[in-house]
């Protein structure tokens, strides 16, 4: 039986509630993990150095969005954005070619940090969703374009 607090909910249920209600992340409990499906959000895998610069750009434009480190040691971070009906295939090919960005395909399950230690790699927030909500994918793409324009010598095409 899961541990429950005074309100009758488990710490995992409480964390899911925080992610869903306060931060707008459409996640769910899946065993000991909290997962988020890329069918419900737009997710872009980016090299950590570029993701940090994109985070700075989003911060200065007041469009902060959650950024996740899956804890796999790959050196990549996942930028989360609101889902979009736009076709990103043209944009995705250009970003993959220029700077190793990858739009994660629909249906992939992403593990979010939770109160229970998960089996395997432990995800953690690079940018914790404190008051920020998922930003539109267009805001994230705008920040990516600005960063790539400003540092072409660091990440050549």
Where are these regions (language model features)?
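Signature for HUH/AEP ssDNA processing cores
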Residues: 1-73, 83-85, 131-134, 138-141, ...
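Extracellular structured ligand-interaction cores
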Residues: 41, 74-76, 107-109
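Catalytic core of tubulin tyrosine ligase-like
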Residues: 79
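DNA replication initiation modules
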Residues: 87-157
């Amino acid at each position: 039986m899961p541990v429950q607090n005074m309100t009758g909910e488990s710490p995992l249920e409480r964390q899911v509630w925080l992610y869903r209600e306060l931060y707008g992340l459409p996640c769910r409990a899946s065993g000991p993990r909290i997962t988020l499906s890329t069918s419900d959000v737009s997710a872009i895998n980016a090299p950590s150095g570029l993701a940090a610069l994109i985070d700075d750009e989003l911060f200065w434009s007041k469009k902060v969005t959650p950024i996740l480190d899956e804890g796999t040691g790959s050196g990549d971070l996942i930028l989360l954005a609101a889902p979009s009906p736009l076709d990103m295939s043209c944009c995705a090919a250009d970003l993959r070619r220029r700077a190793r960005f990858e739009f994660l395909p629909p249906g992939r399950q992403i593990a979010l940090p939770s109160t229970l230690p998960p089996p395997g790699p432990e995800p953690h927030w690079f940018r914790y969703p404190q008051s920020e909500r998922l930003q539109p994918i267009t805001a994230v793409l705008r920040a990516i374009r600005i960063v790539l324009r400003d540092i072409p010598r660091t990440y050549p095409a």
